[in-house]
């Protein structure tokens, strides 16, 4: 149950702990636009804190009890623990507290047509694509995405309509605090096993998310995914299905890939062709993402001709098959893939790209994920010619000594050549010494592996 209801409080001043984060800063910007007095704290200055200060927010660097200056509400991120001095002070003063997901859910309630994009993979790309299709179709949405989107100058754009769109993350069941009119489920996979017990627990969370959609609302469901099919049954809301293999309302046909691996395809709705579509983002996984976007905007009343025209304008987002440059005639591409399914999809996209050899540099993300999916990770790199594994990026976790990157390499080499190199500078030098013109260097992971790509490009 949601502990905080914005409608029950007369709020003027809201304080955000961790205001410099990409999501919290966007929430702060929306609240500022709606006339709230905003204060907040973060551990360091950034472009986001400077931007918020310019918009009128009061920003404190560092966390301290004296930063709590009688706000009506305190909002905190998952990274802010119960022993944070500002949380402690708010509790002492009896000030209501809400976590980031609760606050975002309360904002969603203010919009008649809030859209929440859920799924184990593809959320940021699909949210960005739907956002731009809505924007180009003059629906003027308020947009909050989890990545940098050049077309809106960041990750937040405040519109004046009743449309709102954001990602809906399943981790710690955050999305069960949201209020979508349209919910989208792209796929369901085993992930975040430091919280979820197993796939049944994960499916249960997604089912509860779908049940939050009102009777007059819509679930946009990927019917090629067996788990999504299962949880899409027996819902009160309208269910709109899409797929490539399984009979669905929206289906992609005649899929072809250009010389550079870019897909084009026809789409039918309930058996009738509604248009031909070409993407400027590679990979079959992006055909699925675009089908979700096409179905969503079609439900919103956008003409398929307009969807087809505008979909080609989407060039992708930062850290999603992001072509950063060339060194020694080899293309350097960076991607956020950090799950076995995502690794395979990204390598499949790279394989369709013109190349001699694919050099894959993967940084495992969190010890818990690496341990839980170790065997799946080991089987994910078969499309790469050379595999380099870096040290594990710990994120929120501590190293318990149970799993390490050399252990992953030991499993990979049973099927495919791979090596462990811990240091980023050492990896960059190794790549520079071995790559040739026409090769692809692909850095992958949700941590800071992109720094290797930047180091390599600096070598030239």
Swiss-Prot record:
UniProt superkingdom: Bacteria
One of the GO BP terms on file: cell wall organization
InterPro entries: Mur-like_cat_sf, Mur_ligase_C, Mur_ligase_C_dom_sf, Mur_ligase_cen, Mur_ligase_N, MurCDEF_pg_biosynth, UDP-N-AcMur_Ala_ligase_MurC
Annotated localization: Cytoplasm
Keywords for the protein's UniProt record, in alphabetical order: ATP-binding, Cell cycle, Cell division, Cell shape, Cell wall biogenesis/degradation, Cytoplasm, Ligase, Nucleotide-binding, Peptidoglycan synthesis
Residues reported to bind ATP: 119-125
UniProt pathway: Cell wall biogenesis; peptidoglycan biosynthesis
Enzyme kind, highest EC tier: ligase
Keyword Nucleotide-binding included in the entry's annotation: yes
EC number, as in UniProt: 6.3.2.8
Catalysed reaction, written as an equation: UDP-N-acetyl-alpha-D-muramate + L-alanine + ATP = UDP-N-acetyl-alpha-D-muramoyl-L-alanine + ADP + phosphate + H(+)
Molecular function GO labels: ATP binding; UDP-N-acetylmuramate-L-alanine ligase activity
Main function: Cell wall formation.
Name of the protein: UDP-N-acetylmuramate--L-alanine ligase
Organism of provenance: Alkaliphilus metalliredigens (strain QYMF)
Lineage: Bacteria, Bacillati, Bacillota, Clostridia, Peptostreptococcales
The encoding gene: murC
